[in-house]
């Protein structure tokens, strides 16, 4: 019943497919069976299916068959630190983190690069003190000072600015199928937009982006 409702919702809203973003404790013994049933119904309706997975973790309960059912696997190469680890201030999504995630899924797990996308964050973490960490949007950093668009941190506020995003696009363009974003609503809808930065960098590589990016 759930699978049929998901497919119906996807079709009624003219979506391209479904992203299965069940994480950690939500990945239970029924996960793989659910994924395979969903894949069958989506494929019958010419719809795609992707999954978002941690940067360097493959859940043990996911079978090889279920893993291979995804059209794309989105590598969540962020949240290496955050509100759950207030005593460890620092960058939660560095270029090195992205390289590690790429290496894990492509080389250790063996997923072909054409089925992988690199997740980038449009948000950051403010390590206010040893017990308090709050998230913030990239848009808020740019709104406070336009020059923050080209930084990765201001004091104990860590995020991804345009130079790091460009480097990650280069990494993805050379090794993977594309970029995944969490999430668009956190972008600065100005000339400092990270989405526009991604679009321009891909254009440099003669890669056509979607209408969402203006190409």
Question: Which stretches of residues belong to each language-model region?
Answer:
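Glycan-recognition patch characteristic of GH18 chitinases/ENGases
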Residues: 1-10, 89-91, 95-96, 103, ...
């Amino acid at each position: 019943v759930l699978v049929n409702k998901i497919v119906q919702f996807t079709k009624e809203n003219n979506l391209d497919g479904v992203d299965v973003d069940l994480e950690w404790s939500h990945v239970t013994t029924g996960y793989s069976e659910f994924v395979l049933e969903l894949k069958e119904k989506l494929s019958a309706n010419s719809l795609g299916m992707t999954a978002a997975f941690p940067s360097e973790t493959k859940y043990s309960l996911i079978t090889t068959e279920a893993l291979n059912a995804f059209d794309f696997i989105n590598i969540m190469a962020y949240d290496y630190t955050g509100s759950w680890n207030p005593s460890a201030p620092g960058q939660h999504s560095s270029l090195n983190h992205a390289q590690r995630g790429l290496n894990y899924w492509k080389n250790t797990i063996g997923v072909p690069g054409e089925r992988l996308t690199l997740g980038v964050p449009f948000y950051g973490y403010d390590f206010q003190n040893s017990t308090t960490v709050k998230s913030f949007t990239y848009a808020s950093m740019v709104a406070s000072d336009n020059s923050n668009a080209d930084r990765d941190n201001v004091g104990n506020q860590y995020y991804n600015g345009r130079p790091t995003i460009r480097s990650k696009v280069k990494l993805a363009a050379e090794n993977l199928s594309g970029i995944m974003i969490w999430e668009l609503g956190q972008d600065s809808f100005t000339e400092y937009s990270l989405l526009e930065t991604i679009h321009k960098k891909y254009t440099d590589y003669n890669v056509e982006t979607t209408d969402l990016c203006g190409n």
